[in-house]
Amino acid sequence: MEQITKPHCGARLDRLPDCRWHSSMFAIVAFGLLVCWSNAVGGLILAQLKALGWTDNSTTATFSAITTAGMFLGALVGGIIGDKTGRRNAFILYEAIHIASMVVGAFSPNMDFLIACRFVMGVGLGALLVTLFAGFTEYMPGRNRGTWSSRVSFIGNWSYPLCSLIAMGLTPLISAEWNWRVQLLIPAILSLIATALAWRYFPESPRWLESRGRYQEAEKVMRSIEEGVIRQTGKPLPPVVIADDGKAPQAVPYSALLTGVLLKRVILGSCVLIAMNVVQYTLINWLPTIFMTQGINLKDSIVLNTMSMFGAPFGIFIAMLVMDKIPRKTMGVGLLILIAVLGYIYSLQTSMLLITLIGFFLITFVYMYVCYASAVYVPEIWPTEAKLRGSGLANAVGRISGIAAPYAVAVLLSSYGVTGVFILLGAVSIIVAIAIATIGIETKGVSVESLSIDAVANK
C-alpha cells in the first residue's frame, strides 16, 4: 500500500497570496453571519406579539432566557460535533437546524410552541457562530488573519441595523399577525441562500482534514485550492516554508481542555469573552435606562442611545484597519483599560454634549474589543484538533456571564446609581486585562500550526 505523506496544508495555505479565493471564503462566511439574525429580531418580534396579546413581562423574560440557554447549549455541543464532522459539514448542519426552527417557528400556533422553537433557534445559532468565527481562521494566512476575521465581524454586525430597517419598512404594510412571522421567514430564506453557497463553493478545511489524518483528502482539496489561485493570479506560488515537525496528528480528547496548556487557554478565552459579554450587553440593554436615571427624559434618552450606537460599526471598522498592526495582547489590554477609564468618566457626565461625545467613543472602543474578542483572538488561540470545542467551551462560559450581569447591574443601579454600574464594568475590564497580560499568548502573524504544536504537545 502506498505511503501517503503529510501534506503540510497549513504552510501551503499561509504562503498563498491574497486573491479571489480568499475573498470568496470571506464572502460566504460574512454573508452567513449577516443573515442569521434570528437573535437580532427577537425584540421586534416581542413588540408585535405584545400588541397581539401573546406575551406579558413574564413570558417575554422566558422568551429571552430560552434563547440564551439554547445558544449556550449550541456553543458547547456544536463545537464537539464540529471538531468531529468538519467545518463545512458543521456549517451546513447548523444552518439547516437554524433555518428549520425559524420556518417552523414562523407558523407557531401559540406562544409556548414559539418558545420551544426559539430554544432550537438558539442551539443552531450558538453552534453556527462558533463554527463560522473559529473555522474561518483555518482558511486565512497567519500574516493577515486578524484583518480577514475583522472584516467578517464588520459585515456580520450590520445584521442588527439591517433587520431593523426591514422591520420599519414592513410594519406599515403587513398586519401584526403576519409581521412577526415574516420577520422569521426573511432570515430563513436568506440563510438558505448562504447554505446553498456553502454547499457549492465552501471546501472542507484542509487543516482539519490533515489534523484527522485524512491526508489523501487534504491533499486533494489543497491541490484544488492551489490550482485555482494560480489561475486567478497568473503567477507561480511562492515556495512552501514548513513550520511543523512532520509528525502524525494526535487525537485531542475533550478532557484535554481541562488540563495543562489547553486549560490555560480555556481560562484565557473565557475571561476575554466574559469581559465582552458583561460590557457589551450591559450597554446595549441598559444604556437608555441609565440615561433616564441621570434625569434625561425618554425621548432624549432614545436619541442619545441611537447616536452613541453609531460608534458600533465605526469601532469594528477601525479594528479592521489596525488588527494586524498591533500585537494581540497589547490591543486587548489597551482596549480594556480605555473602556474602564472612559466608562468611569462617562458615568460622571451631566452635559448632553459630553454624554454624546464620550458615549460615542466608549461604544467605539467597546466594539473594537467585541471584534477583537469574538472574531479574532478567541478563535485563534486553539489548535486545529480542538478548535471548535475550545472556542465553544469558552463561548459557553462567556454566555453565563451574560445571563448573570443584568441582575448585578439592576442591583447596582438601584443602590449606587450609574457610577456603581460603570465601576463594575471597569473592574471586570481591569481584571480581564490583567489575565490577558499574564496568561495571554501572542497570535498576531503566528501560524495555526505553531499554536497547535505548542498546545497539543503540552496538553
UniProtKB/Swiss-Prot annotation:
It is found in: Cell inner membrane. It comes from the Bacteria. InterPro entries: MFS (IPR011701), MFS_dom (IPR020846), MFS_trans_sf (IPR036259). It is a multi-pass membrane protein. One of its GO terms (molecular function) is transmembrane transporter activity. Pfam families: MFS_1. This is Putative metabolite transport protein YdjK. It comes from Escherichia coli (strain K12).
